[in-house]
């Protein structure tokens, strides 16, 4: 386990002294439990966690890639750059969260209540850092009754 300062220090080394990148990693993506104990101190640790989880799934299929082959694709963000929720959620046993960044919801019904229901769904997703898309063509244009 590590503390926040150790995560910042190790992440700054990984990001060649970039304080902003280190801070974003530490606050959004480093594996941490509810008590504030960190289990990853740099993106390299995160890439190991992701590789382990991807391999767990891969191993269920014929000709799986090895955990190390997967890690080599992720290492240093050279070939694959997982985004947002997947980086913090995949293989994370300390919190339950969605690993999807974007959601498509039903088109709103053309009524006050229907629009409010869609708005409530949008707000619930947005407060959990998700992006939302929906088709508004079901709503009457202005001036039509």
What are these regions (language model features)?
Residues 1-145:
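Extended catalytic cores of very large enzyme megasubunits
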């Amino acid at each position: 386990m590590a503390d926040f300062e150790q995560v910042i220090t190790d992440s700054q080394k990984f990001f060649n002294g970039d304080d902003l990148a280190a801070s974003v990693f530490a606050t959004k993506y480093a594996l941490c439990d509810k008590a504030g104990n960190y289990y990853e101190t740099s993106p390299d640790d995160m890439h190991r966690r992701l590789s382990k989880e991807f391999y767990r799934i891969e191993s269920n299929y014929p000709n799986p890639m090895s955990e190390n082959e997967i890690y080599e694709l992720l290492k240093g963000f050279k070939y694959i750059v997982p985004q947002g929720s997947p980086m913090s959620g995949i293989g994370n046993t300390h919190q339950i969260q969605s690993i999807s960044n974007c959601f498509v919801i039903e088109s709103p019904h053309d009524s006050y209540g229907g629009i409010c229901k869609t708005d409530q769904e949008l707000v619930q997703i947005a407060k959990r850092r998700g992006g939302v898309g929906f088709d508004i063509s079901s709503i009457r244009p202005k001036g039509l009754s």
